[in-house]
């Protein structure tokens, strides 16, 4: 089965291809099929993921899988949340993962409450009008470090310390990260849903 990934993020594609490999599905980036980015006008991960999945399905004629993910920092009332990808631009930096990390660490200077969660919401639709989308949510809670640690992964991986492991996601090998990450948890739920309802 071929499924279009409603994302152009190469990190998400690599992670999700590995995580969904047991199903034998072929995951293809929407950009490779000539599809642009969907609008993400909503304030929740699930609404944005659903909008992205429906958009990709409508423009490709294929079932679609979308991921909307972000960092929710307790000290900031859950922000940046759905605005995670553009977080740095709020503070005068160019858009980008390294600048997001930089902006986060700058904004957290002098803040002792460093609890945060990475959240991944996966939504799969068989068609643009699918009345029963599959929805899976993964969440991992950790502490924001005071400086980046590790060189693996992407996004906020270098600054989210996992208390149970004593390491950031960026300090872990990919297979360990995938087993413990927010996206890995959501993907495991999605695997079960796809097996039960689609395959």
Swiss-Prot record:
Enzyme Commission no: 3.6.1.66
Catalytic residues of the enzyme: 68
Catalysed reaction, written as an equation: XTP + H2O = XMP + diphosphate + H(+); dITP + H2O = dIMP + diphosphate + H(+); ITP + H2O = IMP + diphosphate + H(+)
Co-factor requirement: Mg(2+)
GO terms for cellular component: cytosol
Oligomeric and partner information: Homodimer.
Protein name (Swiss-Prot/TrEMBL): dITP/XTP pyrophosphatase
